[in-house]
């Protein structure tokens, strides 16, 4: 990079806790959410998951407090199709005060997005959204 060049940010890859069972967390992300494990550590301490250009690092860490305080927002094109895909995976409805995975309602927001949230097995909340034109 030359002295006059400005840095360009390309991607953000969050690291999130897997919860009590790394194998179950991997299965949830692969089978329910459609991610692919691009890398799995031999000792299963972490895995790099990918779907499209989005990457998530899943850590073999059981920390319910951290998980419940972690949330991600993933922007995409085709939020309606993704919501239908996740409904077909029989992810149970999202309830605020219930542990376990959950699927939130698809809604339009006042800030110009159409979105829904998924809570994973550890309690991490992931919002999938599309900007409305």
What function would you assign to each model-found segment?
Residues 30-31, 50:
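Alpha-helical segments within the soluble intracellular
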Residues 7-10, 64-69, 110:
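Short glycine-enriched loop/turn motifs at secondary-structure junctions
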